[in-house]
Regions:
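Conserved, charged catalytic cores of large soluble enzymes
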Residues: 1
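Feature representing long, continuous alpha-helical segments
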Residues: 105-112, 121-124, 128, 182, ...
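Short amphipathic alpha-helical coiled-coil/interface segments
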Residues: 5-20, 127-130
Length: 206
């Protein structure tokens, strides 16, 4: 039975305990996904490792360790990748949720988590990389916004199983792709005035 506050709202107490018990890895200084079938953590660098910051389920010390251990491996030219580069030993066919692809929901949740724990500079660096990539791709290509990007190359061009909605002319949704549109608005709102001016100059140039 869920724990509840006196006002009837669900309590996060049990959730926090579960996150700490199953997802936190003190040795590696990060949270990991947990494989319930195996009963063990997946020791793999992924954007989801930063999600406990968004949910407010970690201490300041854990947040610092997680940002230090995970963000450098995930932050690319065009924003935060879904995963770190996958080694040749475990990689199969290129999948859209793997490196080097980045998705708007990941960016938004991680920005909010970084901001929540006071990592403003890191948040703005990540948002600037993502927003700048979208602006370049939009102005240089078809004027609209696709669902995902290759953040390593900073490009809308992908070669994965389901293609890229909005990146080919016979499948361009009117008005762009919802969550990518939202990430552009939310990302711009988080930038410094200097970063916004740099993006304005970029849009005028390309």
């Amino acid at each position: 039975e869920d724990e509840r506050h006196s006002d009837g709202e669900p309590s996060l107490g049990g959730d926090i305990e579960g996150v700490q018990q199953y997802l936190w890895n003190e040795e590696h200084g990060t949270f990991y996904d947990y494989n319930v079938s195996r009963g063990s953590q997946n020791h793999f660098v992924s954007a989801t490792n930063l999600f406990p910051l968004w949910a407010g389920l970690c201490s300041r010390e854990q947040a610092e360790k997680t940002v230090k251990s995970q963000l450098p491996a995930l932050l690319c030219r065009g924003g935060i990748a879904s995963t770190a580069p996958i080694s040749a030993e475990i990689s199969g066919p290129e999948r859209q949720w793997d490196y080097p692809y980045g998705w708007a929901p990941h960016q938004i949740l991680i920005w909010e988590g970084l901001e929540r724990y006071g990592f403003k500079e890191e948040m703005q660096r990540a948002a600037f990389a993502w927003v700048g990539m979208i602006i370049r791709a939009t102005v240089e290509y078809n004027g609209l916004i696709p669902e995902k990007f290759n953040v390593e190359k900073g490009s809308h061009k992908t070669d994965v199983e389901y293609g890229n909605v909005g990146a080919i002319f016979d499948y361009v949704p009117q008005g762009g792709f919802g969550w990518t549109n939202a990430s552009l608005v939310l990302g711009i709102a988080r930038l410094t005035d200097a970063q916004k001016a740099e993006l304005d100059a970029l849009a005028d140039k390309v």
